[in-house]
Amino acid sequence: MYKSSENINRFTEEIENTFWDDLEKFNFEKIKREVANLKKEYFSFEDYNIFIKILKRLKADKRKNVNGLYLNFYKFLLNQKKEIERVRQMYNFDKYFGNYIYVAGTDEVGRGPLAGPIVAAAVILNLNYVEDKKLILGVKDSKKLTQKARYELSQTIKEKALSYSIAVINNKEIDKRGISWCNNEVLRKAVLGLKLPVELVLSDGYAVKNLPVRNEFVIKGDSKSVSIASASIIAKVYRDELMREYSKVYTEYNFQSNSGYGTKEHIGAIKKYGTCKIHRLSFLRNIV
């Protein structure tokens, strides 16, 4: 793996000076592994000349299976270019609102479930990226990602964020205050939990009340804003993990699968076993 800048530079030297110039000396499996490593680590189109060299070597090789790697890698680069352009647009969207240094995106998950808390996250990213390598590729609306992709992106976002914050309001408070108040409050708490002086808050769908800084709401923000999408991913992963832990205590309700939402199976379990300590009783008046 070529994670550090030192390793990236060394890998670049290897590409330019050894392996790809002597491709015929290596067997197919070795070449296949090297192409796979490129896909994992080497996606920046600032390295365009290196990619062209590799493609030419793969295409010129006399082995058909190596030529197949050329087509595979070429398609990968085209898709990667589209992804870089898509994510660039999401970064640029957040920069459009003004010359701010610290822009926070915030989003919540868990407004509608019958059980468990509502969770929000707020994220500040470095929007002034210099290289494509600095972009968080793959970021999008958390609902459009697989569980595995969400988890991996959540880890990457936390590592690259300038600051992030997670806020939680439990089911008891939801029953006491109502979901609308809790929805706003959990977003507000997430923003106020950031460790940097926020200048602008971008929120998904509607404004967050009682914030001390400028707030712009964005319709379908988790598809347009990199900061909102990042917050959406962190919040979703955090809540899903929490519900999996609850499922170990309250085994009857299959929380690890339904995350507390009102699936047919979940409602059936409530009718059979009654409620547990994390159910939102105010949501169950027509069920129990």
Swiss-Prot record:
Q: Which UniProt keywords apply?
A: Cytoplasm, Endonuclease, Hydrolase, Manganese, Metal-binding, Nuclease
**What cofactors are annotated for this protein?**
Mn(2+); Mg(2+)
General function of this protein: Endonuclease that specifically degrades the RNA of RNA-DNA hybrids.
Q: Which reaction does it catalyse?
A: Endonucleolytic cleavage to 5'-phosphomonoester
Gene expressing this chain: rnhB
For this entry, the protein name equals Ribonuclease HII
Matching entries from CDD domains are given as: RNase_HII_bacteria_HII_like
Q: Which Gene3D superfamilies match?
A: Ribonuclease H-like superfamily/Ribonuclease H
Natural source organism: Clostridium kluyveri (strain ATCC 8527 / DSM 555 / NBRC 12016 / NCIMB 10680 / K1)
- Write out the annotated subcellular location: Cytoplasm
Q: Which GO terms describe its cellular component?
A: cytoplasm; ribonuclease H2 complex
For this protein, the record's PANTHER family field holds:
RIBONUCLEASE H2 SUBUNIT A, RIBONUCLEASE HII
Give the NCBIfam families listed for this entry: PRK00015.1-1, PRK00015.1-3
Q: What class of enzyme is it?
A: hydrolase
Family named by the database record: Belongs to the RNase HII family.
EC?
A: 3.1.26.4
A GO BP term, please?
Answer: DNA replication, removal of RNA primer
Among Pfam families, the record links this protein to: RNase_HII
- Co-factor: note: Manganese or magnesium. Binds 1 divalent metal ion per monomer in the absence of substrate. May bind a second metal ion after substrate binding.
